[in-house]
Amino acid sequence: MEEIQRYLQLDRSQQHDFLYPLIFQEYIYGLAHDQGFNRWILLENPGYDNKSSLLIVKRLITQMYQQNHFLISANDSNQNPFLGRNKNLYPQIISEGFAFIVEIPFSLRLILSLEGKKKKIVKSHNLRSIHSIFPFLEDNFSHLNFVLDILIPHPIHLEILVQTLRYWVKDASSLHLLRFFLHEYCNWNSLITPKKASSSFSKRNQRLFFFLYNSHVCEYESIFVFLRNQSSHLRSTSSRALLERIYFYGKIERLVDVFVKDFQTNLCLFKDPFMHYVRYQGKSILASKGTPLLMNKWKYYLVTFWQCYFSLWFHPRRIYLNQLSNHSLEFVGYLSSVRLNASVVRSQILENSFLINNAIKKFDTLVPIIPLIGSLAKAKFCNVLGYPISKPVRADLSDSDIIDRFGRICRNLSHYHSGSSKKKSLYRIKYILRLSCARTLARKHKSTVRAFLKKLGSELLEEFLMSEEQVLSLTFPKASSTLRGVYRSRIWYLDIICINDLINQK
């Protein structure tokens, strides 16, 4: 971010007012693709070179306003051969650059708030990991009873996302350009259904899509800040946690006025001291220690409020009320539940002995084996029953490249599911990938699996078959002697910032 501040050379208090001129600055598009800024990007969007010409960018914006619909001339293709192979290069450059520009004021506000507090910055990077959610669930969900499983709907219209940015970005020219860009290039209704969004807009413009979508979701999530502050049993949340919001206190006052006007008689229903909210991508969880009646009231009041004030059209059937003790919650690639562990304690007083039965609630995380096998079958590693099959590969790939690809997939899945309470399902996934790799190699050499392994030996699969215990010993070499048996327990890593494609497939 120091490079951003040096490039911009603008007054900090006025950066969010003059974003439009930055669109015509060539270095912005270089920074947008700089590998050094990958830590600020959730998902990379490769597919074109990192050098963007200022002439190309200016020509694209001119064509947008002249209704030329992103025509690429022959001269452009001759100057840059890559343009002939990718007709979406122009819109991708603009979307990446615009996403980088609108993120600048929010990133700088975060840095300003944490200046001189480097320890907190380090902690904020750790909290970016998906696995950081599960320690929070372990500490809190074991004491809760019911959970609302919420599927967040997509905005009805992209115009809603643009209107949300008006609270954060005051530069009207930039917002007009964004609206025009979305109207000309993207399907305005592409976000109504997830399938259309994943196939058209979000895949090619992931960074811009996630920024617009998260900004809209953060708007309606502000209601939870108000409800938490209204609870007499909870401490108020510092506004530092919502630094990306402009006029935070003004919005809170507006929410107070809304509730006093429309929900005055029912405000006491939200006095729940054990309400917790977690969200990732298009799914959120609202858990409480309250009764089913209270949770149903939460459900209908929140749905009504979101529909009236945020144009977020929830269907009541998209919100499921379940009891944690007898229901497994599917969230970010895990099946989570709260189960009772019975333990018997023998107590003896003088000559009399007693057996005391204790039931302790424990947060349990399992690997969803059936959806994961379905993802492997979709990727042609096995059939729908989980039987490994050979995967067609290019003939010019060497055996080591094939083994490395299969091994990388296996290690990524093992790394992500290291927090599973039971490893048997994970071992089954490893077996499928291992045998699929062997069948693929045997198919390439036109031989059987047994003959291939007998001829070349099993040492070729050593890297592929590296156990989790060996990975831990490499990660913590000084403490390898004390890690025996640790691999059998749950381990949460703080370097996982995105879900593997095999885990995220539906």
UniProtKB/Swiss-Prot annotation:
Localization per record: Plastid, Chloroplast
Molecular-function GO terms, alphabetical: RNA binding
Signal peptide feature range: none
Alphabetical keyword list: Chloroplast, mRNA processing, Plastid, RNA-binding, tRNA processing
GO terms classed as biological process: mRNA processing; RNA splicing; tRNA processing
Name of a matching Pfam family: MatK_N
A GO-annotated cellular component: chloroplast
Family label: Belongs to the intron maturase 2 family. MatK subfamily.
Job description of the protein: Usually encoded in the trnK tRNA gene intron. Probably assists in splicing its own and other chloroplast group II introns.
PANTHER family recorded: MATURASE K
Protein name: Maturase K
Species this protein is from: Olea europaea (Common olive)
Gene: matK
